[in-house]
Amino acid sequence: MFASLTSEQKLLLKKYKFNNYVKTIELSQAQLAHWRSNKDIQPKPLDRAEILRVEKATRGQSKNELWTLLRLDRNTASASSNSSGNMLQRPALLFGNAQESHVKETNGIMLDHMREIIESKIMSAVVETVLDCGMFFSPLGLHAASPDAYFSLADGTWIPVEIKCPYNYRDTTVEQMRVELGNGNRKYRVKHTALLVNKKGTPQFEMVKTDAHYKQMQRQMYVMNAPMGFYVVKFKQNLVVVSVPRDETFCNKELSTENNAYVAFAVENSNCARYQCADKRRLSFKTHSCNHNYSGQEIDAMVDRGIYLDYGHLKCAYCDFSSDSRETCDSVLKREHTNCKSFNLKHKNFDNPTYFDYVKRLQSLLKSHHFRNDAKTLAYFGYYLTHTGTLKTFCCGSQNSSPTKHDHLNDCVYYLEIK
């Protein structure tokens, strides 16, 4: 599986596959306080170097397996379906992809013109033109964009280029298209594009803000934090290039949407960590007593299985299991948990079952100034702080003085599940 991926791409897939990435999201108290007062996450989790690392590893786009895999479930600028089953679109898609490459490779004058526009508007020199563009992540990592090309400026700015090659205009020039427009209006929409053009005189093009292509470009500018972009449409013998300014209102809405989603994932992850303590899971049934009819014995059975109650939804603190609290206890307990790390093991198999709960291990480690900075990682790997101030695993009883090395017995069931 994933045979075409390099070792670097496999690392990126493991880290940034959407379902993996969102489970790592957490907020510090400072970040949470900043979000509450400013509705913005600072600092952002992804820096420029990491964003470019992903972009370079996903070049080739649809020909690159990593690009396809990272798009799954992620909010992309095109907002298109991840799987296209419409066979009627295939000729148009194949034509468009081939023509986009041709446009980039054979139109140096167009690119020179774009550079002149950029440098006159932004007052910063273009230092690199990337024609084989991969996928850009936003600094929060939830949204992504894959323009057809981009310019990199001396001041660090990125400018996206989106190229459209409508199949319908493969044999139609701009003037032929204008002739076919009506006569009652001064301007007309150009079908299959986001363009608006005047009927008479020298053609003057502008973008329609309600069109999907306009929104796609604005999402690209949001993800890349670009002040502008270029929208290119190919006709038979013509290229139409429109410079598109950043729509701050649109981008602010995108920012708000992504910030809220990021916080929601962080809260969900925080809940999962909190509910890895059995007492917290049991308390959840008491807190939400109006949302269930389970007996005390049934609650104990579900708590032992790692389940807690969250506003009418039964969830597992160790995996993605979810169920409605109206479901019977027997039915809930019979359902399978996929990739669950609760293991449902008997405590007698552990060296010190008192520290089976992650939270208890974490609390013990936080008492040590020496291990405090690595407490979360150590607790995850099963370590707790003994009364003598040393590290020991609750599962197989291994002791270790180095917080960066995780030594468990070869047959340790807990470590075999989490490593």
From Swiss-Prot:
The record's annotation in Pfam families points to:
Viral_alk_exo
Give a yes or no for keyword RNA-binding in this entry: no
Provide the top EC class. hydrolase
Protein EC = 3.1.-.-
Keywords in alphabetical order: Endonuclease, Exonuclease, Host nucleus, Hydrolase, Late protein, Nuclease
Spell out the InterPro entries in the cross-references.
NF-kappa-B_Signaling_Reg (IPR051703), PDDEXK-like_dom_sf (IPR011604), Restrct_endonuc-II-like (IPR011335), Viral_alk_exo (IPR034720)
Q: Which GO terms describe its cellular component?
A: host cell nucleus
UniProt xrefs under SUPFAM superfamilies: Restriction endonuclease-like
The regions listed as transmembrane in this protein's record are none
List localization entries: Host nucleus
* Gene Ontology MF term list: endonuclease activity; exonuclease activity
Judging by the UniProt lineage, the source's domain of life is Viruses
Q: Which family does it belong to?
A: Belongs to the baculo-herpesviridae alkaline nuclease family.
Q: Tell me, how does this one assemble?
A: Interacts with LEF-3.
Function statement = May play a role in maturation and encapsidation of viral replicated genome, by promoting DNA homologous recombination. Exhibits endonuclease and 5'->3' exonuclease activities. The endonuclease activity displays a specificity for ssDNA in vitro.
Q: What is this protein called?
A: Alkaline nuclease
Origin organism is Autographa californica nuclear polyhedrosis virus
Upper classification of the source organism reads:
Viruses, Viruses incertae sedis, Naldaviricetes, Lefavirales, Baculoviridae
Q: Which gene encodes it?
A: AN
